Amino acid sequence: NRQTDGNLAAVYQMLRAQGESAAHILTRDLAGTTVSAFDANIEYSSILGEAPDLGVAFQTDPVGTQLERVAKIIASRQEFGVNRQIFLVGAYGYDTHSAQPTSLPNLHSRLDAGVSAFSESMKNMGIFNRVTLATASDFGRTLADNGDGTDHGWGGHQFVVGGAVNGGSLYGDIPPPSFEHGQDA
């Protein structure tokens, strides 16, 4: 809105002045760094505003929105002047100690839709063989049900998607398909 834009413009001008004239070196440095961040954000937004159509509709949930932004950056890679990039996208809500039977299918559906749209956008750009998407997590889940969900465990399932992925294999040791064994959490 105009009020916010006006306030940001005033803050920007104040920081620019502080970066040039503040008495303390740390004040000048902080102001200069913040002005550089403002400038980079303006350029970033301008480039993304001109990004080509991805040819696929992404969902508007957090995963879909983030993956769409990554796809637009990749589509605009020449304008950004970079050949190799690593992006981190966050997907939250998987700590399902309770209500797992109703929440987990929705989470999986969102992840599936986001990864599918992202993969299709890479195919539409003709670069599916040059882009790899991988999942990672800091914890896994137990196989045993706690009555309404699962608790923290030793590992979890991860996957890798991309045209260059040589799929069809499982990596790591598969625990016995039973409870109360030495590898059970």
Tell me the role of every PLM-derived stretch.
Residues 122-147:
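Metal-dependent active-site segment of extracytoplasmic phospho-/sulfohydrolases and closely related
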Residues 85-87, 129-135, 154-157:
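Structural beta-strand/beta-sheet cores of well-ordered domains, especially the beta-sheet scaffolds
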